[in-house]
Amino acid sequence: MCSSDLIESVKIAKQKNLAMVAGFCWRYDYAKRAVFGKMLDGTIGDLRAVYGTYLTGPVKPMPPASSRPAGMSDLEWMTRNWYNFTWLSGDGLVEQAIHTVDWMMWAMKDQPPTSCTATGGRQIKAEGGNIFDHISVAYEWPGGVRGFIAQRQITGCYGENSFYAIGTKGNAYIHRGHYTTDLAGERTWKYEGPTPDMYQVEHDELFASIRAGKPINNGDRMVTSTMAGIMGRMAGYTGQQLTWEQALNSKEEIAPQNLRDWNGKVEVPPLALPGRTKFI
C-alpha cells in the first residue's frame, strides 16, 4: 500500500462516516494533551523549533543465521524477525520513533514539513536485516521553523524519550514530567492533573464517537505523521535533502515482489549507503 492508497482510504472512510483511529496513542494521553495545548495556545509564543528523542536499545536483535531452523523459508525467517527488515518494520524511525515524529507533527499543527535532511547508519554490526541503528533528521517548515528528531537503538547507551519545544516567549517540555518555562528557564506551569491509561481513553473516545454518530477519523494526521517518518528515513538512507512532494511521489517499492510464494526465494536490498543509495 502506498501513500496515495492510504489517502484514498481516509477519504472513503469520511464519505462513509466510518471511524478511523490511528495507533498514535499519545494523542489520547491527558498530560500530553495539556502540554501540547500550551505549545499551541500561544503560552510559549510562536514556535521556532522542536527537538524530539527516542534513544533506546535494540527492540528485536537479529539472531544469527545459524539459529535458523532447517527448511524455514525466507519469508517465515523474515516475518519472525520482522523488526530487522525495512519492508516489514519501516526501520526504527518509522516503527518506534514514529511516536516522536508524531509529537513533532502535533506541535506543528499537523502541517507537512517542506523538506528534510538526515544522517544515520548502522554502527553495530548486525547478523542480518537491513535497518539502521541510528538516525537524526532535521525538518524545515515555512518561516525557518525547524524540527529535529534523534533516534537510536544501541545497547549500553544513554536512553531518553523526550520532547522540547522552543518558543518566542518560553519553552515546553516532555522530560521527567510535562511543564513550561519562561525564556530564563524558570518553570511557569506543570501538569498535575489526572493520568488515566491512554489506551483506555483512546478506546473510550472511539466508542463514544460511534455511539454519538460522530465517528473519530484520525486518518489525515495519521498519513501526515507516517509520511514524515518515511521522508526522514528516505533522506537518511540516500543522504539527500528531500522535499515533501518528492517523498509523497516516490516510486520506491521496498516490499519483495514474490510475496505470494511462502516458500520462494526472497531478495531484500542490502543496508543503505548514504550517498550511494539512490532516491527513487
Across the structure, where does each feature detected by a protein language model lie?
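Short, small-residue-biased leader/transition segments that mark boundaries at the very start
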Residues: 1-3
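Catalytic-core regions built around general acid/base machinery
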Residues: 5-13
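Predominantly a Rossmann-like dinucleotide-binding segment in NAD(P)-dependent oxidoreductases
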Residues: 14-22, 26-129, 162-164, 171, ...
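Short catalytic-loop micro-motif centered on adjacent basic/acidic residues
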Residues: 20-23, 148, 218-219
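C-terminal helical cap and adjacent loop that interface with cofactors, partners, or active-site loops
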Residues: 76, 89, 95, 99-113, ...
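Active-site beta-strand termini and strand-to-loop segments that position acidic
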Residues: 138-143, 166-168
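Phosphate/diphosphate-binding loops
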Residues: 147, 155
